[in-house]
Each structure stands twice: as structure tokens, then as C-alpha cells.
Swiss-Prot record:
One of the record's GO cellular component terms: plasma membrane
Membrane topology: Multi-pass membrane protein
Organism lineage string: Bacteria, Bacillati, Bacillota, Bacilli, Bacillales
Taxonomic source organism: Bacillus subtilis (strain 168)
Name this polypeptide is given: UPF0750 membrane protein YxkD
Cellular localisation: Cell membrane
Length: 278
């Protein structure tokens, strides 16, 4: 229950940040956006329709069509995110900051949007619209969520050329790129993963200490030295970046002659890391 309350809080805060990106930075500078929000802005520039109301109607329609591609939790979280975002778009409409620097506003629009959407996606929700398409692409095509979202968003952005012009469209693309990078940071965090390969005569002692002291699993692989022709068992360990110094200390204490390779890892799914179903 506590985790769900924290998740809902993250959804609401994320929706607020995204609404600020639109009302504080995008609309005052005639910038576009991707997905449903981009369509909402086009309709606002053309007909002065309320972004909050339009956003809610369009996303509700897409949810009715695409909810079957989302699991139960994601659907509920998406409904909360869409409702909160539409509400905040309405409440913050007309807010402004005293800045006429288009480049600065573009950067901050990307940062706020990236933080907002990143928080929503991190807890398992979406902002509906193109985010639903990105989730589907991630689930069935194994596309990176952030870049799938960027792809679908760009389709709407290029369409906005006829409304906001070439210069503002290019600034919008910059905003989306910044948002994608910030979103990646929010979703992945600073917990860069490392995969460690260890070849040692004291492999059993190292593996036992990693299990006991670090509470990490160790996989034993079979290998063979080309020069010696001897068969060897190789340890393969996946850890968080901040655990690397402790692992090095364990290896040094067990075998100062151990051969160790440290690999950078982009994503790790499974027990002890990220649930692969998310």
C-alpha cells in the first residue's frame, strides 16, 4: 500500500512537471510537442481550444482503443497520469515566467518534460497517446521506450511545421531531444550496472564471499585457456556501479593474481535488478 501511494505521488508530480513544460515554456514561445500534447498545441494555436480539455478527450479516446496493450497496473497508472496532467494543464494555463530567451526556454521545456514523463514511466505508467505506442513497440519490438517515444513524437512535430514554422519546429526537435535524454536519466538513474568476469584459482572462495557479503548471485561459466589447454571455471557477476569497489576488495583478499574484466552494462533485468515485465 505504501509503495502504491508513493507511485501515485510520483505520477502526480510527474504530471505537474509536464504541465509546466507546456504552459511555462512551450506555449509562450510557440513551440510544438510530440504525440497527443503536440496535437493539443496545434489545436490551441489554431482554435484557442483549452489544452487541458483537449488533452483529456484525445487521451481518453486512445486509452479506450489501446488499454488492451497495457497490463492492469499500467492502465490504472496511466488513467491517473492523464487525469492529473489534464487537470494541471488547465490549472497552470496562463502561467508565465519573465524570459524571452528562446534557447533557454527550449532547454527548460525539454528538462521539465523529461523529468515529468520520466517520473511517470519509472513507476509503470504512461502519458497515453504516443507513450502507448512506445510501450507497444517496447513490448513487441524490444525498442527502447525513450527513442520509440521520440520517433512517434517527431511525426507530430513535423506536422506542426505548417502551424509554427520551420524555426520553431527545429527548436521543438531540440526540446524533444533534451527531454529524451533527461527521461533516460530519470528512468535509469545513476545506478549504472557492471558485469564482472573473474578468472581465479580461488573461485569458490570469491563466489562464497560475493554471495554472503554482497548478497549477489554468481554464475560459473566453463572456459579453456588456448595457450595452456587447461579447462577453467570463470565467474560472471553483475552488480551496481557503487558495489564495484567492494567486489574488488573481496577479489584482492582472496587472490591477488586473479584476472578481472569489468564491462559496462546498459540494461539488466531479473531478480535483484529490474523486473523484466515492466
Amino acid at each position: 500500500m505504501k509503495k502504491r501511494m508513493l507511485d501515485v505521488l510520483m505520477l502526480v508530480i510527474g504530471a505537474f512537471f509536464f504541465a509546466l513544460a507546456v504552459n511555462l515554456f512551450a506555449i509562450p514561445n510557440d513551440l510544438g510537442e510530440g504525440g497527443v500534447t503536440g496535437i493539443t498545441l496545434i489545436l490551441y494555436y489554431l482554435f484557442q481550444w483549452s489544452p487541458g480539455v483537449t488533452n483529456f478527450i484525445l487521451n481518453a479516446f486512445l486509452l479506450l482503443i489501446g488499454y488492451k496493450f497495457l497490463d492492469g497496473k499500467t492502465t490504472v497508472y496511466t488513467i491517473i497520469a492523464v487525469a492529473a496532467n489534464s487537470l494541471f494543464l488547465h490549472l497552470t494555463h496562463g502561467w508565465s515566467i519573465p524570459s524571452d530567451e528562446l534557447i533557454i526556454n527550449t532547454i527548460f521545456a525539454g528538462v521539465f518534460a523529461g523529468v515529468g514523463i520520466g517520473m511517470i514511466i519509472r513507476v509503470g505508467g504512461t502519458t497515453a497517446g504516443s507513450a502507448i505506442l512506445a510501450r507497444i513497440a517496447n513490448k513487441y519490438l524490444d525498442w527502447n521506450i525513450s527513442y520509440a517515444l521520440l520517433f512517434f513524437d517527431l511525426i507530430v512535430v513535423f506536422s506542426s511545421y505548417f502551424i509554427i514554422g520551420a524555426e520553431k519546429m527545429m527548436f521543438t526537435i531540440v526540446m524533444l531531444y533534451i527531454g529524451t535524454k533527461v527521461m533516460d536519466f530519470i528512468i535509469e538513474g545513476l545506478n549504472t550496472k557492471k558485469a564482472i568476469t573473474v578468472i581465479s584459482e580461488n573461485k569458490s572462495e570469491i563466489a562464497e564471499q560475493v554471495n554472503t557479503l554482497m548478497d549477489r548471485g554468481v554464475t560459473i561459466l566453463s572456459g579453456k585457456g588456448n595457450y595452456t589447454g587447461q579447462s577453467k571455471e570463470i565467474l560472471y557477476i553483475v552488480i551496481n556501479k557503487q558495489e564495484l569497489s567492494m567486489l574488488k576488495k573481496i577479489i584482492r583478499s582472496c587472490d591477488k593474481k586473479a584476472f578481472v574484466i569489468v564491462h559496462d552494462v546498459r540494461d539488466v533485468f531479473g531478480e535483484g535488478f529490474v523486473d523484466i515485465s515492466k
